[in-house]
């Protein structure tokens, strides 16, 4: 199991550290470290602090993703999903949420607002060429394999 250093910031005292909901969950729930209720109006967005900072090992990233229940039931989504936390970032993990629903959504301290997946990252070295191998799909893009 990968060990990751985590720093609980002052705003995160009293909140759980990011945690897996089930033994086989891929994502860790992130908790809102807000001092007072935060209202996200329909069409609006907000930045939600989580009260934690990470020291990811080289070769890893943290991906910030929407929680499926918030997205399906309330239209609350991570705006830049997946958001990437690089291994050299040391600031507080902050989640940008958007309300694509039709009603105000209230975020309270300790609410689970997003999921975080720790994933390996492969760096690349470009090999510039004059052509690339043809495939049966070719340049077919959006919708070319069906909808």
From Swiss-Prot:
One of its GO terms (molecular function) is magnesium ion binding. InterPro entries: dUTPase, dUTPase-like, dUTPase-like_sf, dUTPase_trimeric. Its cofactor is Mg(2+). It catalyses: dUTP + H2O = dUMP + diphosphate + H(+). One of its GO terms (biological process) is dUMP biosynthetic process. Keywords: Hydrolase, Magnesium, Metal-binding, Nucleotide metabolism. The keyword DNA repair does not apply. The keyword Hydrolase applies. It comes from the Bacteria. SUPFAM superfamilies: dUTPase-like. It holds the Pfam family dUTPase. Substrate binds at residues 67-69, 80, 84-86. Its EC number is 3.6.1.23. Pathway: Pyrimidine metabolism; dUMP biosynthesis; dUMP from dCTP (dUTP route): step 2/2. This enzyme is involved in nucleotide metabolism: it produces dUMP, the immediate precursor of thymidine nucleotides and it decreases the intracellular concentration of dUTP so that uracil cannot be incorporated into DNA. Belongs to the dUTPase family. This is Deoxyuridine 5'-triphosphate nucleotidohydrolase. It comes from Anaplasma marginale (strain Florida). The lineage of its organism: Bacteria, Pseudomonadati, Pseudomonadota, Alphaproteobacteria, Rickettsiales. The gene is dut.
């Amino acid at each position: 199991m990968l060990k990751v250093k985590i720093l609980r910031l002052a705003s995160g005292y009293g909140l759980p550290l990011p945690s897996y909901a089930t033994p086989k969950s891929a994502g860790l729930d992130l908790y809102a470290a807000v001092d007072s209720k935060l209202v996200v109006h329909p069409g609006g967005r907000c930045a939600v602090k989580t009260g934690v900072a990470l020291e990811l090992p080289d070769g890893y990233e943290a991906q910030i993703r929407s929680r499926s229940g918030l997205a399906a039931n309330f239209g609350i989504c991570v705006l830049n999903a997946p958001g990437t936390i690089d291994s050299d970032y040391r600031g507080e993990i902050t989640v940008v949420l958007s309300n694509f629903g039709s009603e105000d959504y209230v975020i309270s301290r300790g609410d689970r607002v997003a999921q975080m997946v720790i994933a390996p990252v492969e760096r690349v070295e470009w090999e510039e060429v004059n052509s690339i191998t043809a495939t049966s799909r070719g340049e077919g893009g959006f919708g070319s394999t069906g909808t």
